[in-house]
From Swiss-Prot:
Job description of the protein: Major role in the synthesis of nucleoside triphosphates other than ATP. The ATP gamma phosphate is transferred to the NDP beta phosphate via a ping-pong mechanism, using a phosphorylated active-site intermediate.
Protein name: Nucleoside diphosphate kinase
PANTHER family found in the cross-reference section: NUCLEOSIDE DIPHOSPHATE KINASE
One of the record's GO molecular function terms: nucleoside diphosphate kinase activity
Record organism: Pyrobaculum aerophilum (strain ATCC 51768 / DSM 7523 / JCM 9630 / CIP 104966 / NBRC 100827 / IM2)
Gene: ndk
Length: 183
């Protein structure tokens, strides 16, 4: 089904930098419709439950960071004490909880033709250093994996976007009751 819904979260750095309106306008200009939106101060428990703890998710998150470190010539053992993708994923998840609870976030549901795919394209790659100009992370991110490693934290990359239609469904149900999502 080409018309679908997806979840987008504007992370604390996007909110703190006053980029909410600018980022939202990108999606509206791309033909996506906002069907739910709220600003929340998430608790550590909510973020802990929101991001998966499966070995598959931890490994995937860890591999993304290890790839970024490799591209930047960073030794993961020296910076974070391990090069095991699952353990790196655990470190990322702990840092994500701290980051995502450091300030308010804006959570929204976008609807449109191939919404998941379009949002992912507009957002750009997870790591800002490899996000091309024209993407949200490429145009607005001011962080990088090497700076984040130096400061012992996760990369501030402005937004979270669902990876797949099935993930979007789970994530939308997590943040919104059915009656909060308009058609």
């Amino acid at each position: 089904m080409p018309v679908e819904k997806t979840l987008l979260i504007l992370k604390p750095d996007a909110v703190a930098r006053g980029l909410v309106g600018e980022i939202i306008s990108r999606f509206e200009k791309a033909g996506l419709k906002i069907v739910a939106l709220k600003m929340v101060k998430a608790s550590p428990e909510e973020i802990e439950r929101f991001y998966p703890s499966s070995e598959e998710w931890l490994r995937s998150a860890g591999q993304k960071l290890l790839k970024a470190y490799q591209e930047l010539g960073i030794d993961p053992r020296a910076k974070i004490g391990t090069d095991d993708p699952v353990e790196v994923g655990r470190i990322i998840k702990r840092s994500l909880v701290k980051y995502m609870t450091s300030g308010p976030i804006v959570v929204m549901v976008l609807k449109g033709n191939r919404a998941v795919e379009i949002v992912r394209k507009l957002v750009g790659p997870t790591s800002p250093h490899s996000a091309p100009p024209g993407t949200i992370r490429g145009d607005y991110s001011i962080d990088s994996p090497d700076l984040a490693a130096e400061e012992g934290r996760v990369v501030f990359n402005l937004v979270h976007a669902s990876d797949s239609p099935s993930e979007a469904e789970r994530e939308i149900r997590f943040w919104f009751r059915e009656e909060e999502v308009l058609e």
